[in-house]
Structures are given as C-alpha cells and as structure tokens.
Amino acid sequence: MEELTAKEENQQVLKVLEALKQASHELQSNPRPNSAIKALLELETESESILSTDPSLSALSHHLSSLKTIVDSLENSRARHGLRSFVTRRVTTHEISRVAGSIESEIQAWIDRESIENLASALAHAPPLSDDDEKALIRILAHFQNRLSQGFNRELQDLILKSKVFSELESVLINSNYPRIVREQVAFAIDELIRFNKDVFVGQILMGQAIRALISLSSSSSLKVLCSLIKSTKSPLVDEIESNGDLSKIINLLKSEDPSIQVMAMNCVLEIGYFGRKEAIDAMIKADLIRILVDLQRSELGGDLIEMGRWEEEERARGRRERRESRERRFLESHPFASCVARFAVQLEVGEGLRQREKRAVKLEILERVREACVSDAEAATIVAEVLWGSSP
C-alpha cells in the first residue's frame, strides 16, 4: 500500500512538473507576461506544497520564486517611461527567458532521475513476468528510447552510468527466459544508447554478450538492431562477429522461411560486406554465401534490373507514373533480393574493409562461385555481367 501511495505521489508530482516544463519552454521563446507566464505563476502557487516535500526540487522552487520577483519587476517598469525603463525591460525580459530555461532544465533532471530509477527497478524483475510487469517494462523502455533520441545530455549519461543501465539491459537481452518482445525492446534501447553516445557505450557492446544474443534471437527486430549497430560501430564489430564464428549463423538466416528475417539478414550481409576486413569476407564466402545469394536472386523475391524494366512497363500500363528513383525503391520493396549478388559485390567494391588488391581478388572468387552456383549459362551470364559492371539499388 505504501509503495502504491508513493507511486501515486510521484505521478502527481510528474503531472505538475510536466505542466511547469511546458509553460517554461513556451516562455523561453516568448518571454513576455502572456498566458505562459500566467500559467507558470499559477502552477507555482499550486505546486508549492508538492515542491516543498522533495529536497531535490529545492532549486526548482528557488527558480520559480525568482521568476515571480522578475515578473513583478517587469510589470513595475512598464508604468515608467524613458530610456532607463526601456533598458530595464529589455534586461528583465532576458532574465525571464534565462530563468525559464533553468526551470525547464531542473524539471527535466528530476524526470530523468525518476525515469532511470523506474527503468532500473523494472529491469530487476526476474522472469517469468506477469502481464502487468511485461507491459510496464515495455512502456518504460519505450519512454527511455524516446528520451535518448532527443540528443546527448551529460547529466542523463551520468545517471545511466551510475545506475549501470547498460549491464541491466544486456542481462535481460541474453536471458532467454524473458519474453521475446521484451528482449527485442531491450535491443532497440541498446541501439539507441549507442546513438546517444557511441564513444562511451560502444566498448560495452564489443566486450559484452549483446551481439551474440542478437544473432541467437534471430528475429527481424534483433537483426534490424544488429544491422544498425554494424553501421554505427563499423569494422570493429564485424571483427567481433567473425572472431566469435557467428558470420555463418547470419548467413544461415538467409534461408529462413520468414521473408522478413531473410530481408534483415540480407541487410546485415550488405553492411558486413561494406565494413568487413578480408578475414570476415573470406569466412562469408566459405560459408557458401554466393550460392545462397544466387538462389535468392532466382526466387520470386529476386530478379534483376532487366526484370525491373519489364516491371516498369507493367506499372505504366496500369497508369502509374513515378520518378525512376521511386520506381526502383518500390521494385526493391517487392523484390528485395533482386540483383543481390551484384549488390553484395558493389558493397565490397565501395566499402572500407578491403584493400584494393583484396577487392580484385574477392571479385574474381565471386565470379567463379557464381558460375558454379548457376543452373544455366544464361543465368550465369546475367549475374556475371551485373557483378562486372556493378548493380546497386
């Protein structure tokens, strides 16, 4: 009961602070005695009893009192005329904007502290989770991701590090006893942490077990996160995947019966091709990647750019008229493995992982394996031509 009461009190405080934050945000862009100031001062009166009970809100209480004093000063200066009064009003208006900014910062800091505490507490619940706990955790994780997406904030980063949030997230991700949907939401939160500050959190990704967990989870969502992390972390992450022997697992997902998993695995393969060093590329080719790509290109979801020309004619016959880029994008949405062998070869060619001499050698090996994998001379000729001349979406 006490815990419930504390939650209710926090919700009441949060509701008041959100209203104060909105009013102070509006006041920064228009620091004049308008509806925002009126709302802020009314809220200051209403929230006095709430703010006085929380020591961490004492600075906010001080800023609100200062704002009231400054607004009174501005109102008094309007009754007078002359240069001095004009300058006073200008300075006072600037002070209102500054104090409003301080109010917003203090409120956000309080909200961040509460949010990180709630996140750490929710992540500490051992599985199995009740339906209510699962929904609450997913909601808290979504809120956390949204906060991180607003950009870097040093105070927030300090809270995250002090609360060891990354370690808690990783613990949930690698624990197969948690529901898949929870682990996927945790994966998205980890990805957002890397975007928030790659320099601080990438080391924990490379040294921990998160990458192996993403691959073993083998869902379209986990592969989407993996693909994003490869883009962010580049060659070092590909090196880690290769050293763990997990490249073959990603390639095997190209043979999944779920097209969404196949597509995301293909995206991962393309990113690995761009950033992978020779050891990684060699491992992928030895894992029979080229034969698998040829099979995918031959499938209903495959095709080549020549087929795209025929598809364009059919679309025009139906009355569709679009720019070429839009038509290409729509074609690849419905044929995600079109020209996939050449697209992989292009990634190697333009990528950062291979030296020029290595690129030439790998291209020759790809051509050889294409000829071995094709079921007809015509198919081989088409794919070889695409690889030689380049084919990209």
Which functions belong to the PLM regions below?
Residues 46, 50, 77, 126, ...:
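Residue-level signature of the C-terminal ends
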Residues 159-168, 204-219, 240-249, 279-300, ...:
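Alpha-helical scaffold repeats of the Armadillo/HEAT/TPR superfamily
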Residues 1-105, 109, 113, 329-393:
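Long C-terminal extensions of eukaryotic subunits of large macromolecular complexes
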Residues 212-268, 277, 281:
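Eukaryotic tandem repeat interaction scaffolds
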Residues 5-8, 12, 28, 35, ...:
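Short amphipathic alpha-helical molecular recognition features
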Residues 3-5, 26-27, 50, 122-131, ...:
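Helix-loop junctions that connect tandem helical modules in alpha-solenoid scaffolds
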Residues 133-146, 178-194, 218-228, 257-271, ...:
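Alpha-helical solenoid repeats of the armadillo/HEAT superfamily
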Residues 66-69, 73-198:
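Alpha-solenoid helical-repeat scaffolds
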